Amino acid sequence: MAEKITRETSLPKERSSPQALILGRYEMGKLLGHGTFAKVYLARNVKTNESVAIKVIDKEKVLKGGLIAHIKREISILRRVRHPNIVQLFEVMATKAKIYFVMEYVRGGELFNKVAKGRLKEEVARKYFQQLISAVTFCHARGVYHRDLKPENLLLDENGNLKVSDFGLSAVSDQIRQDGLFHTFCGTPAYVAPEVLARKGYDAAKVDIWSCGVILFVLMAGYLPFHDRNVMAMYKKIYRGEFRCPRWFSTELTRLLSKLLETNPEKRFTFPEIMENSWFKKGFKHIKFYVEDDKLCNVVDDDELESDSVESDRDSAASESEIEYLEPRRRVGGLPRPASLNAFDIISFSQGFDLSGLFDDDGEGSRFVSGAPVSKIISKLEEIAKVVSFTVRKKDCRVSLEGSRQGVKGPLTIAAEIFELTPSLVVVEVKKKGGDKTEYEDFCNNELKPKLQNLTADDVVAEPVAVSAVDETAIPNSPTISFLPSDTE
């Protein structure tokens, strides 16, 4: 939805009276902000004690305004762009009168408020710009274009990290017309690109890059590059690219800005060119993360936690794979027993009954049945990962394989989870959690399936499973494995 949420600053910190829980688990707190169609409240999950922000949307107003399609698109976009520098959508709920967006609560407020106090130091501005570019690049790789980037839509968490918010004006790649361009006029005047003003068609990726350039200028200068009391005069300056960098801007920064605020979108920097720029690269680290149990997990944080215990082993492990170094070394008590599948699980695994695609955008996957021990299956997955230089993460009977190469849609990430079918049979479900679909299919066909086909369990005879929902050809009479096709194959 394209409305502006106004922050409330004068409301009391505590609620004057207790309220009923929203859908049984959220305790509503103070009003954080409001717009034409929605109000945003601070809330607390009474089960986890976690603070969240809940956007409460008036259904009647949305219906009258014809904005249902906007709501659906915003939900779809927020589900698609899960990144440490993007405000996360946890869940969506609805009643007869209201729609609730349960979102990450970002405590630090708008970046705009920080810039309003004066220009930032170069290293601070660079950090925010790096995080902004990381987030926007991630969005574009998934076919999402923000189209309203500005400091008011950039929030800061308690650790001073940037979070991109407000995807109400965002577009997705399937909205592109036959000419390969977008045609909707949107955005905030001071941050809008010249080609949008021309009202001809525009490349939304290049429009976001222009906005990032304006934001960088504002962070470093403390004021807008294109400013005039008269809006039409400001538009003329934008269209002509008329701006001056202050004397305290370094030569490197000035050159970068000239490429970001290039009026010709064909000559404007692309994201790969930005990330190769010398000013941008200072102190930059690629953000590595993965999604587990519906939560974002930072790879760097895991490494730091393990660095003390691993430090003394570095010399002796120099010849070992990097996979072993990154993998958690907690192996007390052996592997737990896999979760057992009930009849409903087995039915959902059968072709035509798998509903996971309704909830998971990256639902591509395969399943196979094996009579081999869980430890042997996990070892085989680790072996495959080692050959292709993938990082391995293990938790109980789940294994995550993460590629090091930054593909078109980020690094390829594959999750494998093992379930108990019978005392001597397990089902292994393999899914793509991130990265390009073609790259995933190549990996499965050339690496995963050929190597797993040879997997056997010593001295184990698999017993038949009398469940009609499972394809008979998928139940082996020997310890060898057999792939069950998923609904995406």
UniProtKB/Swiss-Prot annotation:
Induction: Repressed in roots by salt stress. It comes from the Eukaryota. InterPro entries: Kinase-like_dom_sf, NAF/FISL_domain, NAF_dom, Prot_kinase_dom, Protein_kinase_ATP_BS, Ser/Thr_kinase_AS. Residues 336-360 form the NAF domain. The modification Phosphoserine is found at residue 170. Residues 363-392 are annotated as: PPI. Expressed in roots and shoots. Residues 26-280 form the Protein kinase domain. PANTHER family: CALCIUM/CALMODULIN-DEPENDENT PROTEIN KINASE KINASE-RELATED (PTHR43895), CBL-INTERACTING SERINE_THREONINE-PROTEIN KINASE 12 (PTHR43895:SF140). This is CBL-interacting serine/threonine-protein kinase 12.
